[in-house]
């Protein structure tokens, strides 16, 4: 899943390890989420949202546009 996690982390000058500590996950988990190899659980997504003070949908892009771009 595409996301803004790397950008948000960089804006705070946090390493992946530092963000992992804030979220109680490993540096490897942060890397996997940032690169889209792993989708966070809903509780983790909420934790990320609270940490950065942004709605989940502004951090994560699930690729669903609600039919906005449907051809018909």
Segments from the language model and where they lie:
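DNA major-groove recognition helix of helix-turn-helix/homeodomain DNA-binding modules
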Residues: 43-58
């Amino acid at each position: 899943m595409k996301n803004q996690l790397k950008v948000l982390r960089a804006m705070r000058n946090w390493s992946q390890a530092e963000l992992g500590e804030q979220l109680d996950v490993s540096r490897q988990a942060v890397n996997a989420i940032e690169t889209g190899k792993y989708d966070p659980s809903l509780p983790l997504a909420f934790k990320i949202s609270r940490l950065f003070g942004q709605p989940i949908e502004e951090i994560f892009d699930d690729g669903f546009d609600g039919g906005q771009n449907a051809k018909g």
